[in-house]
Amino acid sequence: MRLKTAGLLTLATLLGGATNANAAMLYDIYAGLTLGAGGQTIFAGDDNNSTSAAAYGAVIGMDIPLVRIELEYNYLNASESHMHVGMINAYFKMPSTVIKPYLGIGLGTVFNGDVDDTFNIRNEAAYQGMLGLTFDIPVIPFNVDVEGRVLYAPDVFKTADAKPDLLHYDLRLKLRYVF
């Protein structure tokens, strides 16, 4: 009887361990930081104002074999404007080994910012597209993403005669810790 009980406990332990190992293979949870450099243009009718810009942010997400979903916060800092951006992103990954190309889209909002310390940025919808490469570091639980991205936000603030649009574009480095 003791041998039968010991065998059942051993089997339960092995099956429980196998279940956890398989669950870890299905998806990964991650958190990370981003840093980007590029430019932005504010379009107001025939008047276009382009400046250099930087982006700083944080992400948290879930990585599934062919898709990655994440929540992202960014602070966009240009010489004439400063703003906060919250996005929900979806990435579609090409299956590969260590270097994985991907294509991404995002939907979110631009909020709490200003242009020339004169105009307050309204809470407006924002859209973005990303194209990049993920470098999977197999020995340590980090992934490094290098990507180009374009963010578009229509009617970010209102003047007496115009509702300018924002186009932000940058090259971004993202470091993700995989739990």
Language-model features, listed with the residues they occupy:
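A short acidic, helix-capping loop that chelates divalent metal ions and anchors anionic groups
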Residues: 41-43, 113-115, 155-157
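Solvent-exposed loop/turn segments connecting transmembrane beta-strands
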Residues: 44-52, 76-83, 117, 159-160
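Outer-membrane beta-barrel "beta-signal"
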Residues: 166-179
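Contiguous, function-dense segments enriched for cysteine-driven chemistry
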Residues: 142-153, 157, 168-170
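Gram-negative (and chloroplast) outer-membrane scaffold detector with strong preference
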Residues: 59-128, 135-144, 174-177
